[in-house]
Amino acid sequence: MHEVFSLSYDPVQRHLAIEKLVVREGLEGQEKKYYRVRPARWYGGIVTADCVGCGLLCKFCWVSDKVMNRPVEVGKFYTPYEVAHGLVSLAKKRGLRQLRVSGGEPTIGKSHLLQLLDRLEREGCRFVLETNGILIAYDESYADELSKYDFVHVRVSLKGCNEEEFAMLTGAKSDGFTLQLKALQNLIDAGV
């Protein structure tokens, strides 16, 4: 019997490797790379800060290859304060009350995300956290820390309906699907 050569990757390890490229320590805390802040029609109107970098390579991803495949070259590093200011300023200008980080995986750079949420907590907005869940499964404390923010709505974007579909859609090892389910359980257990 011949063994089939596989190019699949470990989704956790890829997230951690991407994090080294798109997150750095700055004078005011963790800085993360972003490439734009924009209004969007989703959720009845929302302001989105598009970050750089994701640990998955989904075949259907809407992010341009020019962004997805060039995390070192694309975007600029911003502090949580700068991202919060950009989101809130545009939301006020547009009369919107919902905010999110998208364009990449928002859970990459945990300290940055939590500091961003700290900055947004008193703004009277709703924050939609769209995530693949991989790092929420990997880091047992992530869901507990997110539970401190009652204005955050977490949406785990499942990549397929089973391990086989996950592997087919992302190119990652199939057990990544189990990590997505574990993330959901961690969030439920934390009351998120």
Q: Whereabouts are the PLM-identified features?
A:
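N-terminal [4Fe-4S]-dependent radical SAM core
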Residues: 1-55, 59, 63-72
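Short, conserved acidic/polar surface loops in the N-terminal third of protein domains
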Residues: 59-62, 70-74, 111-113, 139-141
